[in-house]
């Protein structure tokens, strides 16, 4: 059983809610690039490491858009971000049907599929990952925490 991570006690630094539609996915990508590259805690980080945060958020939102509301009206998704001096916490919340992440097999990396790599990437890019139903949110929460590495962020 996966550890359920706790949302930080303080209010999120960023809260964004939007319709879960493919139309918004490029905007989410641009938003991620802008917020991660400009945040004071991350301003000294290398581009390839910042890209991993962007990819994590993008893939989490993409999965919600493509899978959470299948056979339903378009739903919504929420993005919450917390910036700490030593980590970034990303939460993507949806109100569609949930799933069991352990039921999704890891892809064959020797013969990678064209699609279906999202959850694998999210887990690999996270230092701590969980997915759970939140009664408080009344929705599904993908929670990922990424430690800010000194080696990629030149000491801070």
Task: Map each language-model feature to its residues.
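Hydrophobic alpha-helical segments
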Residues: 26-29, 57-58, 115
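Conserved beta-strand-loop-beta-strand hairpin that lines the nucleotide-binding pocket
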Residues: 1-15, 20, 65-156
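Conserved catalytic/ATP-binding subdomain
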Residues: 23, 48-51, 75
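Short alpha-helix lining the ATP-binding pocket of the histidine-kinase-like ATPase
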Residues: 58, 62, 66
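Helix-loop-beta hinge of the Bergerat
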Residues: 10-46
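Conserved short strand/loop->alpha-helix "switch" segment adjacent to the catalytic nucleotide/phosphoryl-transfer site
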Residues: 36-58, 111-112
């Amino acid at each position: 059983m996966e550890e359920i991570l706790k949302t930080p006690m303080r209010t999120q630094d960023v809260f964004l809610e939007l319709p879960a539609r493919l139309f918004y996915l490029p905007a989410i990508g641009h938003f991620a690039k802008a917020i991660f590259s400009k945040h004071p805690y991350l301003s000294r980080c290398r581009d390839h490491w910042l890209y991993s945060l962007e990819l994590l958020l993008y893939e989490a939102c993409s999965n919600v858009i493509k899978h959470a509301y299948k056979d339903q009206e378009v739903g919504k998704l929420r993005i919450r971000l917390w910036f700490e001096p030593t980590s970034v916490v990303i939460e993507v919340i949806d109100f569609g049907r949930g799933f069991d992440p352990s039921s999704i097999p890891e892809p064959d990396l020797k013969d990678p599929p064209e699609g279906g790599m999202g959850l694998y990437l999210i887990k690999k890019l996270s230092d701590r990952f969980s997915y759970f139903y939140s009664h408080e949110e009344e929705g599904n929460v993908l929670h990922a925490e990424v430690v800010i590495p000194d080696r990629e962020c030149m000491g801070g």
